[in-house]
Amino acid sequence: LLVAKLINEHNPKRHIDIASRVDGFVAHVASYREIEVVDVRPLKKSVHENIKFRQADLMNSQDLGKTDSLSCLHAIEHFGLGRYTDPIDVDGHNKGITNLVNLIEENGRMYISFPIGKNDEVHFNAHRVFHPATILKHPSIEKSMRLIRFDFVDDNGDLHLSKSIKDVDTNTKFGCGIYTFEKTLTS
């Protein structure tokens, strides 16, 4: 609900979502605006007029046009692990982040969330967990994105709004980082 609220407040011209749950986040956004959904998995034709779907693998560059708003919530940690019909690729999450950043126009926003913990880890047949600061070191993020907001859920399930990455407990095992980036350069 937090990211749906942030998108509503920002009111972008176009919003694309990458692989988030249709029965959760996507439905929340579709209740008040059009949302384009892109996923590697097929989706049955939506009966909701605000949901537009395209099947695509974001580990590969896609010609979706530029957008001023993009979300990828609890999905990037699965890229390249083969769990959702995608090919096995140890670098799948990095390719995915690069391709997400390339879809965003200058001054556009990217909302991305994933599991956070004290170390970068791969959990077999499940997902990755990232140190909260790892994404800041990704070349595409370093080159053209600026973190404008960070929220997180801790191991107890408590939501912490508008915090610093340094506020995450160093012993966190399985929290959720929610990052809002703004694109500063066209790449």
Question: Which role fits each region the language model picked out?
Answer:
Residues R21-Y32:
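Conserved SAM-binding loop of SAM-dependent methyltransferases across substrates and taxa
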